[in-house]
Amino acid sequence: LRILLAHNSLYYPSYGGGDKSNRLLMEALAAMGHSVRVVARVEQFGGEAHTALVRELTGRGVRLDAHGSASVEFRLNGVEVRILTRDAGLRAYFTAQVQAFDPAIILASTDDPAHLMLEIALRAPRARVVYLVRATIALPFGPDSGLASAFQTEALRQADGVVAVSEYVARYTQQWGGVTAIHIPISLLDPGAHPDLGRFDNRFISMVNPCAVKGISIFLALAERFPSVEFAAVPTWGTTAADFTALRKRPNVAVLPPVDDIDDLLRQTRVMLVPSLWAEARSRMILEAMSRGIPVMASDVGGLAEAKLGVDYLLPVNPAVRYWPMVDELMVPMAEIPPQDLQPWAAVLGRLLTDRAHYEQLSAESRRMALAYARNLDVRPFEAYLCEVLRLPRRRAAAGRRIPRAPLSDERRRLLALRLKRAKQHVGD
């Protein structure tokens, strides 16, 4: 199959969970013998971004096929990658790529919340369009949407297939959007060994992407409750300047840079905290940590229960249910964060810090369940789904529908995409 991913984000190198999940999915499809191309973009267009990306890629040993015009082209683990860098005309660039590559399948996803690329994909004369839902906040409907839109909802209904990262997301999509979605595993683990890194004497209680909606308030409160314990925060797309200030005020909190190899963080981690306060679609961090024997304390919201695989601990929170009509300086929608009851979290963490036998039992159970899940986690069910989609008539042709156009200029659509793109879950993981 000729498969084209419309990726309205950087793709590589990137530390976002959704970006990483899309990359591993494309590489797995390429390893199955399919011809796979990705069209992506830098965060901010221009000559400086172009030069910085070229420098970063060459420093990582990536051989560039082309980098002299408006984009950077290279092959990564069997996947053709085209990243637009200098020119803000993403829609025109993607249109040209669709015409040149002539894919049988176009994959779009919630990393394109304003549907800048989905609308073009739906107009492709031959390709089937499959939409990957990795984040409820980037859907155009429902209580967890960052931007409700009847136009975008109608466009999504014309996709030939919709695949959700969790059963929770599949139910949400059906309930609030009237869009039939199927849950198929689309967040694969890195190939290769998953070392046993869980140690009672490891240094840190860790959290990735500390910010308001991810539960930085719980993280900081735990650091205050346990002043003699070392905590580690790894800021990524959601951590604001105010969050950095709050983290640095705590003498027992180390602020660490994000890493390419998650094992570099996990081998220092005693317990992983995932105290999210919004409706997480899923979390690849939970599975990555558990597969290495790291106990995970996660909040009981969204699809996190599925990610925990029935293993302790899933803890109560007061979730954010109201979003303000504004974004922070990182363009993340701002939520009203309710007060939290720290006691359940403090009780569990206290036990994991003092009861070695319990820690080691939970570490072993976490690893056993995660590796059992991972043994059956591969791209073949998704590949079979794509083949099934190809056997059916194109949905928009069968329905005789016109592709809706939202009444927005390209400039406003780009702004809306920018306002939401950092809020996707990887999401999401």
Locate predicted features.
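N-terminal subdomain of nucleotide-sugar transferases
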Residues: 1-60, 224
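Active-site proximal beta-strand in glycosyltransferases
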Residues: 105-107, 120-140
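Membrane-proximal helix-turn-helix segments that form the acceptor-binding/catalytic region
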Residues: 145-161
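Donor nucleotide-sugar binding/catalytic pocket of nucleotide-sugar-dependent glycosyltransferases
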Residues: 157-193, 199-201, 213
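Conserved catalytic-core segment of nucleotide-activated headgroup transferases in glycan assembly
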Residues: 190-251, 255
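Acidic donor-binding loop of glycosyltransferase active sites
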Residues: 267-281, 294
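Short hydrophobic beta-strand element within catalytic cores of glycosyltransferases
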Residues: 295-298, 308, 314-316
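A charged, aromatic-enriched C-terminal amphipathic alpha-helix characteristic of glycosyltransferases
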Residues: 336-347, 353-384
